[in-house]
Structure formats: structure tokens, C-alpha cells
Amino acid sequence: MKAKLAFFLLASCIAVSAQAAKKSSEPAPWMQEPDSFMGIQFDQKFVYSVPECPAGYEIPKEICRRAPYQGLYITMGGPSIGFGYGLSVMAKNGPVDSFYLTTPSENYLHLTQLFITKYGSPTSRSTESVKTKGGGAFTNEILAWKGKKIEIVVEKYTSDINTSSATLRTIASKAKAIQDVDQKINGAASKL
């Protein structure tokens, strides 16, 4: 009887410690997941949320959008965040699919500080080596936040070593984009 009790207690301890180890290796849920960015809601139709920019050369006093190109809108007159930036919005089917903010790479530390202050610590951090056409090598830093509906990726070097970026994307639009690419590949492969 004592042997059975000791075995049961030992098995219970092992099961509890295994479960605790599993829980500690899983990332904590992201508690500061946004439902908007710069005052624009992800789930509202973008064309109704942000007015079209006025014609002419006058600098807009509030955020506005230029005419779209295949669902991509360039915005102007966005709020001041302490450094210069460009903001584009992808909204193919009405609501916002993604926001794409770019800034010179010398603003990267300010950009990361803003995002960490607003959205908390990233759920993951990574680095990768980037080589230029001229042969120079740099280390790209990537911060990522992943929630139930939204994913944010901040990169030190995006398309070149002079540009940092932040991409805020809905998980649903990312899944749809992957599905669309798979369909195109399968369609092209069937023609071989």
C-alpha cells in the first residue's frame, strides 16, 4: 500500500513539473494587442475612416489618403511621433489588412522605444545577417509581437540599410495572402 502511495505521489510530482515546464516555455499572451493604429481601426472600412487628401500642394492638417493603387493607400498628414515617417495602408476589401510605416534607419531606436512603450515587450526578437550589393554586412534586428488578431514586425533594415519599418497586419489577411499565393502556384503548376 505504501509503495502504491509513493508511486502515485512520484507520478503526480513528475506530471506537475512537466506541465509547469511546458507552460514556462510557451510565450506569454500579448496583453496590449491593438485594434487600431494612429487612430484608424483595423475592422472599419478604410475609405470611410480616412478622408481623401485635398488636391494641390497644401500639406494636410490631419491624416488623409491618396487615391489607391491595387488596394494600397499612401497617407499624408499623420500625427507627429517625434521623427519623420511614411505610412501606407493596404485595404483591398474594405477593412484594413495592414499598416506599413517606414522611417530612416537612424530612427530605429526611437521606433522600437515607441512600439515597446505602446505595445509592451515583443513576443520574439531575432537577428539576421544582411549583405549589401557593395559587399557590406550588417546585422538586421527584428522585433515581433503576435496576438490573436494582429501581428507586428519592426525591422531595423527593411528593403535597404537606410530604411527601418514597422508592419502591423491582421492574422486573417496574412492567412488569406498565403492562400492566394498557394492558389496561384497550384494554378501555374497545373499548366506545366
Question: Residues of each region from the PLM?
Answer:
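Non-cytosolic coordination micro-motifs
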Residues: A21-P68, S98-L192
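Composition-driven detection of intrinsically disordered, low-complexity segments
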Residues: F7-L9, I185
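Short, compositionally biased low-complexity segments enriched in polar/charged residues
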Residues: R66-N93
